[in-house]
């Protein structure tokens, strides 16, 4: 999302200060229009590098999350309430890679918006909506993991497919409603009319956000974030206690193999750890952006444009991180990827393939 990347703090510069590169002289986004925004293009070398970096992120977000969705939806062994949440999260990140990143890439490198005023607003709505959708999904996933770790045997009856569906529906409906109401009602621009008028030009895409809405945006981000931090703190305390109890019982009984309950608890702790890393990656990507946006709104938008864009693209790259995290920690996901890319997923009864080693 780029709530702030669409705000009054944006101008027509791109991700790194043009002064850092040998840029050509200033041009216009539309040479034949008097109201055209000024464009300061990069020289060919840096321009190619930026397109490669941003394009790689978009491709990774699209392909990686598509693999996650395909794996979970195709293989029956992965059909669980928790995994459906993960697939829905991957869908939000996939849409960032398809609907947001390519257009932001052109704007960041070229310094102009070439996709029309209507799609400027729609692009911002997608940006905001998919961001908060990811956030809400991660929050619900953390609650799911807490239930699974704290009471693994009762977990299947507490977090059912119905509960998962309600969480998914809530995440999508709330985030889309919030994103579109923020942009299309014009409430975020209240009190900034003169500034908006002075910044308006053809080839620009600035959506002004006043201090009130910056505070609301930050609050909507902060509340689920605090929930996730609190829940995962409890998860790791419980996991640590369970590990100590299992070790103590193993020594006392000298048993050769773990009980079913212990194996379930171990599996749930591993899942909680992996998804905890995904949450940590999300927070590390998003916190700097939101903190800077919040402070900057009350200091007159003094943050240099290139700093904003660096933060924004760190945020965008977060959409590509989760598939990499799953691939690193989940053997079943690596096996699913292999079956998919080799075409074996097209074979008859491939959906019943055993993806787990244990």
From Swiss-Prot:
GO terms for cellular component: plasma membrane. Specifically expressed in neurons of the olfactory epithelium. The lineage of its organism: Eukaryota, Metazoa, Chordata, Craniata, Vertebrata. It is found in: Cell membrane. Residues 1-47, 105-121, 188-212, 296-309 are extracellular. It is a multi-pass membrane protein. Disruption phenotype: Mice lacking Taar2, Taar3, Taar4, Taar5, Taar6, Taar7a, Taar7b, Taar7d, Taar7e, Taar7f, Taar8a, Taar8b, Taar8c and Taar9 show no visible phenotype or behavioral deficits. They however show an absence of aversion to low concentrations of amines such as 2-phenylethylamine, isopentylamine, N-methylpiperidine and cadaverine. The gene is Taar7f. One of its GO terms (biological process) is sensory perception of chemical stimulus. InterPro entries: GPCR_Rhodpsn (IPR000276), GPCR_Rhodpsn_7TM (IPR017452), TAAR (IPR050569), TAAR_fam (IPR009132). The keyword Protein transport does not apply. Keywords: Cell membrane, Disulfide bond, G-protein coupled receptor, Glycoprotein, Membrane, Receptor, Transducer, Transmembrane, Transmembrane helix. The keyword Membrane applies. The chain crosses the membrane at residues 48-68, 84-104, 122-143, 167-187, 213-233, 275-295, 310-333. Disulfide bonds join 37-201, 120-205. This is Trace amine-associated receptor 7f. Its main location: membrane. Belongs to the G-protein coupled receptor 1 family. Residues 69-83, 144-166, 234-274, 334-358 are cytoplasmic.
